[in-house]
């Protein structure tokens, strides 16, 4: 729209419209964010346009008002001529007015693919005309070639300071567009990228890993990266040998290098008593079995099989094995030494090795010859024992004899000292003495009880009166005390209380309980009781003599009967 009235002041567009125009341009997607610049640059342009309003109005008032039909300025796409403006408005003012109204003039130089954008300089309405998009071929060509210098480069940046109202345009330099921005703005497909000439094409990260590395972990490619054993099925062709030949070493040679010959492997047990002597013997063995024997032994350990077959296929490896201490030494399987039978087995007198050769009992094959066990192993007999070879038996150990020390076992491994023998002897004697003491105490106690009981009975008989002795026809010494029964002379007589007649109470009841009128039955129960206490009734069965020759014929008859029974 034109300004109403020729002499009225030229008021610029309100700030709200400017902000709205900038927002529409940014959100419409006409220009990529990388070409349009950051939001900070947009805000700077808005501020500069607001500052320009007052200055532009003043200059226009001084220069005079142009005609209504001449106040419209149109800006076309890159490469078009600047439209004619009024005579009172300079090119710098027209440029700044267009940039303030549309906010797209500074975008036109950066975006080579934008179409023409027209806007009215004096109106507050910004109209963006549809852009003329480039063809795909043109866009491709423009992306690989630097853009040409536009005719109206004044719109690419803020205006330069003018002298006498004339813009001073500096030298126009071509602007370099980064590779990331070289995209077709109007096309739907991305621009293909071509590598530079003279440089190798980079591969994805997944192609960097060598495939042979995984083949080495496979069972089919076993040994591909480990030097490629001769004749192995998993030899990799992608890793040729630089010297032109494959390594000649095998897995068995590797084991032989890592496990050198050691004389200590042959010792079944280690003596804990003669350490210094063993060290000297080991030095002698190393002198006798030197480096030449080691080389011969390694030659014997080489297998006579195909190089492709390794120990991993179930075949035994030729390595030295430790011999258990409970066995006597002979031949070891897989090498030049094996086990032999114990000396107690005379039937098994020969031991054969893997090479088919045989040695006698007590000899072992070492470095192609049969050697004695006693010579090969000086510490075969422990604790200073002497080793001898006996026919059909083998090695025999004669144990060393010392004062109060004895050795025993097949190889003199057990020790018996005088302290052990003394402990056994003292323990046995103490046990026997303890048993004898217990028996003596037991019988002594029994005898003491019997003696005490007899003494009490003698005292009671010594203090009896003649009347008590007349009634004491059945006195016994082993009657227990504890009751005071009444004693009767005969079963038909009444009971008479007597403190000294307790011994007859038990027998009195036995005799008289069956038949009180049968005194002849007294002898039957007395015989059984008197036989049990025969040894204790010898002294007490006879009553003392009556004083003064007095006595009754009946009492004498009872005493005679009692003596006859005893």
Swiss-Prot record:
- Its signal peptide is 1-30
Q: Which GO terms describe its cellular component?
A: cell surface; endoplasmic reticulum membrane; extracellular region; GABA-ergic synapse; glutamatergic synapse; Golgi apparatus; Golgi membrane; Golgi-associated vesicle membrane
Q: Which residues form a coiled coil?
A: none
Q: Membrane spanning segments where?
A: 424-444
* Region listing for Interaction with GOPC, in residue ranges: 442-460
Q: Which UniProt keywords apply?
A: Cell membrane, Developmental protein, Differentiation, Disulfide bond, EGF-like domain, Endoplasmic reticulum, Glycoprotein, Golgi apparatus, Growth regulation, Membrane, Neurogenesis, Phosphoprotein, Proteoglycan, Secreted, Signal, Synapse, Transmembrane, Transmembrane helix
Tell me how this protein sits in the membrane. Answer: Single-pass type I membrane protein
Tissue spec: Expressed in olfactory bulb, hippocampus, brain stem, spinal cord, cerebrum and cerebellum. Expressed by Purkinje cells in the cerebellum (at protein level). Expressed in immature and mature cerebellum (isoform 1, isoform 2 and isoform 3).
The protein depicted here goes by the name Chondroitin sulfate proteoglycan 5
Identify the species of origin. Answer: Mus musculus
Lineage of the source organism? Eukaryota, Metazoa, Chordata, Craniata, Vertebrata
Q: Which gene encodes it?
A: Cspg5
